[in-house]
Amino acid sequence: MALTAALKAQIAAWYKALQEQIPDFIPRAPQRQMIADVAKTLAGEEGRHLAIEAPTGVGKTLSYLIPGIAIAREEQKTLVVSTANVALQDQIYSKDLPLLKKIIPDLKFTAAFGRGRYVCPRNLTALASTEPTQQDLLAFLDDELTPNNQEEQKRCAKLKGDLDTYKWDGLRDHTDIAIDDDLWRRLSTDKASCLNRNCYYYRECPFFVARREIQEAEVVVANHALVMAAMESEAVLPDPKNLLLVLDEGHHLPDVARDALEMSAEITAPWYRLQLDLFTKLVATCMEQFRPKTIPPLAIPERLNAHCEELYELIASLNNILNLYMPAGQEAEHRFAMGELPDEVLEICQRLAKLTEMLRGLAELFLNDLSEKTGSHDIVRLHRLILQMNRALGMFEAQSKLWRLASLAQSSGAPVTKWATREEREGQLHLWFHCVGIRVSDQLERLLWRSIPHIIVTSATLRSLNSFSRLQEMSGLKEKAGDRFVALDSPFNHCEQGKIVIPRMRVEPSIDNEEQHIAEMAAFFRKQVESKKHLGMLVLFASGRAMQRFLDYVTDLRLMLLVQGDQPRYRLVELHRKRVANGERSVLVGLQSFAEGLDLKGDLLSQVHIHKIAFPPIDSPVVITEGEWLKSLNRYPFEVQSLPSASFNLIQQVGRLIRSHGCWGEVVIYDKRLLTKNYGKRLLDALPVFPIEQPEVPEGIVKKKEKTKSPRRRRR
């Protein structure tokens, strides 16, 4: 489709009308360029897909929404906007699209959040009820559907009242009533515990109401994980050929795709035996009480028992073999080098893939049959069986995918990382098996790049080390396929608005020197606080261990510090805003993930402190396997993995400072390697052009460590 004069005029008219809706709107050349580039790509005038880096201040959201809506209307397609997290998804849904609706009154839009973000009306009704009979009726579903106390019941009753009177849409983030994680776990549901069309509340269920709204909407706001799942199952979203897709925060896409394809499952032999026994009893109950018209051969008791017995024997053998590979001790891990399994393990995985797939098919067949049963049956008993079969299907589906992935030598031209872990829970040892591909470009090509005609991938940061090469390698986007890569200029004058401060630290921030380095960092930070030059500050760490140690050095400043983990992030930011608005000093402290998407302008944030260059962890099974693979190709892992990742992280962290033309301040980076190592210049060259200062550092007095047992974290 060509960009007609009428279409261009429509885009220009909306852009002009938008300027009148936004106070102090500043026209920006990069924004106009982005609108033009997005329009050309979505209309098919230039290239296949577009990766466009739009630095903070460009106004990228409105720059893709305006041309996206215009072209979607012209082509009678649906514009799907996907983000990496719920916060940005909600911002687009609750702020940006309502703003556009002022200039496009008939605009229809909705949001597609994951099932776990919505309340389950069945669970809410039970938890809000004061009638024991109501709770008893729903308790048959094996869920914890009774309130813990009267206060919790009253809270649920208020939520139910808001839902029933349409004051609340059922989304966790859209109510002012405090809901802790434990209560929300009982209020929401997952795919395995949902009765779907068989539920009494199906028609009014917020999740399914939202899904039905997708069919009528011109714009759907989703997230990357949901889009990947929708493309895989060909459900939820319209047909790919009838889509225009924008992937905001597109730098997350390869990781989200990899997470979606990562498979982990418990394979502890006694636990597995129990699951198989429960499934055979479940099948027997279905055959006895809800006999299907056509009996699957595998459902015959003798055959099913033999099938499950073979499956169990293979799992037991695998347990024995894996325990031999793992080091002694209750908690242990073994990774298979280059993802290559021994022949005996590979043969077991291949057979397990076939056997679990057959059980998955059997569970699906019974579930479909049960779902079609009429009201002539005992509805309580039927629904109980549907839920149990649904959960069995979920288990065998995951197992089937795991063993299929374990049987693969490569995925997307790279090895599949495979490892086993043993851990202790409540005095019992549990064995797990894990698989994840280190490259997902083939899957992205199949699900996205080849399926959807034109896609926009955008973010404030898509490049690392001034190059799109890492994005291209990880995502599979490539110029020879007609994909375009554009980096827009920043609208800000960084040279005049801020500066980078690299204190003259006495040591590098290595593990060996960590204690002295943090002592010096704390001393310099204290000096900055005492200067009273900045009201709003942000301190970012590469690890929780370092952050905790830093806090040990500044205990007298603790009341000023708002630390990640003390409260949910949005509450910390809310409190920070209130403090600064009242003229008080406030310091946000967290890990690098805490800063992503943080938008604090002016005095709210005028000094950012960065503990050190954040290289990725090198002890993750995925990173180790990728390193082995790169070395086998005579490529240098530091150049391919570590440095691009560190560059990307640093750009993101530094980008927290200048968010508008009125922002000012300093970025303090406590890492002398930026000036002493060869790669330091490359990292600095990829940052906005700030003047650099190198002040002296007060001597830090090293404190003695208190001996504490560090919690074991699960690696991947």
UniProtKB/Swiss-Prot annotation:
Q: Which residues bind ATP?
A: I26, Q31, K60, T61, D599, R656, R659
Q: Which UniProt keywords apply?
A: 4Fe-4S, ATP-binding, DNA-binding, Helicase, Hydrolase, Iron, Iron-sulfur, Isomerase, Metal-binding, Nucleotide-binding
EC nos? 5.6.2.3
Tell me, what is one Gene Ontology molecular-function annotation carried by this entry? metal ion binding
Chain intervals for the UniProt region annotation (HD1 domain N-terminus):
1-114
**Listed result of changing F638A:** Loss of helicase activity, loss of ssDNA binding
How is activity regulated here? ATPase activity is 15-fold stimulated by single-stranded DNA (ssDNA). Reduction of the [4Fe-4S] cluster reversibly switches off helicase activity. Remains fully active after exposure to 100-fold excess of hydrogen peroxide, but the [4Fe-4S] cluster can be efficiently modified by nitric oxide (NO), forming the DinG-bound dinitrosyl iron complex with the concomitant inactivation of helicase activity. Helicase activity on G-quadruplex DNA is inhibited by porphyrin derivatives meso-tetra (N-methyl-4-pyridyl) porphine tetra tosylate (T4) and N-methyl mesoporphyrin IX (NMM).
- Residues of the region (Arch domain) are 262-438
Q: What is the effect of changing R673A?
A: Loss of helicase activity, loss of ssDNA binding
Q: Oligomeric state and partners?
A: Monomer in solution.
Its recorded name reads ATP-dependent DNA helicase DinG
Species: Escherichia coli (strain K12)
Its gene is dinG
